[in-house]
């Protein structure tokens, strides 16, 4: 039996914030992502590490269960190796990204 691979779920979203109710829905979605272990890469781009396909499916299902009514949300599932090969073209790594590499997990 093969060992489960570490993978990443990357969520990209564009949510309407014109009215107070829509801002509230967008904030609730962001709060869900943070509570479910996602880390913000950029504004409206969040990433979460998972181990194996079962965990990936579990978090994908949670994500789908917490979608707001409106907006555009995309999900990309990649291996940790693919994630580690991502190149930063402009700017600097966030403090957390410098401290946690693909061999480490963030524990709370």
Curated annotation (Swiss-Prot):
Disruption phenotype: No effect on CRISPR interference during plasmid transformation. CDD domains: Cas2_I_II_III (cd09638). The keyword Nucleotide-binding does not apply. SUPFAM superfamilies: TTP0101/SSO1404-like. GO terms for biological process: defense response to virus; maintenance of CRISPR repeat elements. GO terms for molecular function: metal ion binding; RNA endonuclease activity. Its EC number is 3.1.-.-. Keywords: Antiviral defense, Endonuclease, Hydrolase, Magnesium, Metal-binding, Nuclease. Mg(2+) binds at residue 14. It is an enzyme of class 3 (hydrolase). Its cofactor is Mg(2+). HAMAP family: Cas2. Belongs to the CRISPR-associated endoribonuclease Cas2 protein family. NCBIfam families: cas2 (TIGR01573). Homodimer, forms a heterotetramer with a Cas1 homodimer. CRISPR (clustered regularly interspaced short palindromic repeat), is an adaptive immune system that provides protection against mobile genetic elements (viruses, transposable elements and conjugative plasmids). CRISPR clusters contain sequences complementary to antecedent mobile elements and target invading nucleic acids. CRISPR clusters are transcribed and processed into CRISPR RNA (crRNA). Functions as a ssRNA-specific endoribonuclease. Involved in the integration of spacer DNA into the CRISPR cassette. This is CRISPR-associated endoribonuclease Cas2. It comes from Neisseria meningitidis serogroup C (strain 8013).
């Amino acid at each position: 039996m093969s060992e489960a691979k570490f993978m990443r779920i990357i969520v990209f979203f564009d949510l309407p914030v014109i009215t107070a109710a829509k801002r509230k829905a967008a904030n609730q979605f962001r709060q869900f992502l943070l509570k479910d272990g996602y880390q913000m890469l950029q504004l409206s781009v969040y990433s979460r590490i998972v181990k194996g396909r079962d965990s990936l499916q579990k978090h994908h299902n949670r994500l789908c269960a917490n979608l707001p009514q409106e907006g555009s949300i995309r999900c990309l599932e990649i291996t940790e190796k693919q994630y580690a090969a991502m190149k930063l073209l402009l700017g600097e790594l966030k403090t957390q990204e410098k401290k946690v590499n693909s061999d480490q997990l963030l524990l709370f």
